[in-house]
A protein has these predicted regions:
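A conserved catalytic-loop motif detector
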Residues: 1-61, 65
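Soluble, non-transmembrane domains of envelope/secretory-pathway proteins that act on or interact
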Residues: 7-11, 48-50, 56-182
Length: 182
């Protein structure tokens, strides 16, 4: 240790996704938390601190094939936090450990951080970039309703629709008939 600098990192950021793609992903990750399907975090946090649970939480869960490791990554527009659950010898965890145990731990941790520094998670909301195109698409196809020709017969493809976000000006494509693509 003679004081010589061996290495100094120089940050050279590279944009990987467009703003539209990034904000669409944020919208998708909001559903991971709010749906409560893969994690009880939202329910646990609501029980512990209802006002903090109203923050704009997005997140991603993860589990290895044999349940040796489980993750929960959480974010608000202001702060990101990740938690891991597992054994150092790769023994499997109980089924549902990520859904319940890690989620509960993370809810208590988030609340403890909030108690130590009130307002740290912020009140900001994630929002879609103005370049995002919204399209009404069929639930069944993910494409816009339309007409297709099958064996010379024109068929109207319609049904229930949902809003779909696109990172292109054109938005969703119109339904087409292509059998055995690939």
């Amino acid at each position: 240790t003679d004081g010589r600098l061996v290495y100094e990192h120089k940050d050279e950021p590279v944009q990987v996704y467009s703003k539209a793609t990034a904000t669409i992903m944020q919208s998708l990750l909001r559903d991971v938390i709010s749906s409560r399907i893969t994690s009880s975090f939202q329910t646990d946090l609501t029980t512990i601190n209802p006002s903090l649970a109203r923050a704009d939480w997005i997140g991603k869960t993860g589990t290895t094939n044999e349940d040796e490791n489980m993750w929960l990554m959480l974010s608000t527009p202001r702060l990101t936090l990740g938690g891991w659950l597992g054994h150092d010898d790769n023994r499997p965890l109980a089924k549902g450990a990520g859904h319940y145990r890690n989620a509960k731990y993370m809810a208590y941790l988030v609340n403890a951080i909030q108690q130590a520094e009130p307002g740290i998670w912020g009140n900001e909301r994630f929002s879609l970039d103005q370049s995002v195109t919204k399209s009404q698409v069929l639930k069944s196809t993910g494409e816009k309703p339309g007409k297709v020709t099958i064996n010379g017969k024109e068929v109207t493809v319609s049904g229930s629709t949902v809003t779909s976000y696109w990172a292109t000006k054109e938005g969703a494509p119109v339904t087409t008939y292509r059998f055995a693509i690939g």
